[in-house]
């Protein structure tokens, strides 16, 4: 007689598994590193797809479980199978009629999920079943946008080959006007940028994003591939202005080396020097003035870079600008001088510097106000802060 304990029947295994999931699914799923961990209200099929026993999923489908079941976020069993990268389950659900184009509450399809997680094999199954590579989420994002943002190069290449949009997918814009190249630049995804550039994608906007995100390698790559160095964003800023605002001195050097014009103004009249001075980026200011940036350029409010540096209390930057000949008593909006702006913000050291460089404490604004500190009288001039010749000495390229 066989002394071995008989194996439970398949039906019993599946029934035990389902009962376990009903009682303890939240604890079990909460140990996973991605995807949903709170499954209150999930039906049996959604739980089985996420838990993963293919035999149980098959049994539930035979018992009439709906492939169009939804969770709280509007995701179908197909969404969850794709999120897990579980190709056999994806194939099974598709064979049982799961709608390949179903969208969740955010407008995302299963192909969006595959693109986000880089599941190339699963994406291929979806595309073979007619998934649209041109599908857009609620914010206008296509699967290609997501693949580009996350650096899934092989998947991005497959999406560009998909029927429908084809190469034109590279120029599709989301709700903010970004293309796949913008998203790749934001993440510094050089391989994806190479793929897109080889297909003729526009790169000017991507250059601006690379500068704004501080992605130096992407910025250099895009310049080498022909992106226009003085392209402008919707606010009129160039890559040089965006890099200056971040104080990215190496990027500034690269852009200047490619012929970037430091005199270009944005729609508020601000030059790259205005932006660097306002943020207190001394090295960026030094680079720009050494390359001929206009030290007394005025924005639409009549403010010079010295006004901006003084208002924010950037005393070293103010000293550098004064060393380069900035007008200490330049008047701007409401006839305010740099001294007025530094004083009303309570920047004592900057006030002392300006006074030591000859700023007049008697000049009055449009409202006949002289410069005054919040606590009362102006501090004395601080001559020791006024020498400052070293602040704006010529800068050697750090190339």
UniProtKB/Swiss-Prot annotation:
The keyword Repeat applies. SUPFAM superfamilies: Ankyrin repeat (SSF48403). SMART domains: ANK. Disulfide bonds: none annotated. ANK repeats lie at residues 40-69, 73-102, 106-135, 139-168, 176-205, 207-231, 235-264, 268-297, 301-330, 334-363. The keyword Ligase does not apply. PROSITE patterns: ANK_REP_REGION, ANK_REPEAT. This is Ankyrin repeat domain-containing protein 65. Keywords: ANK repeat, Repeat.
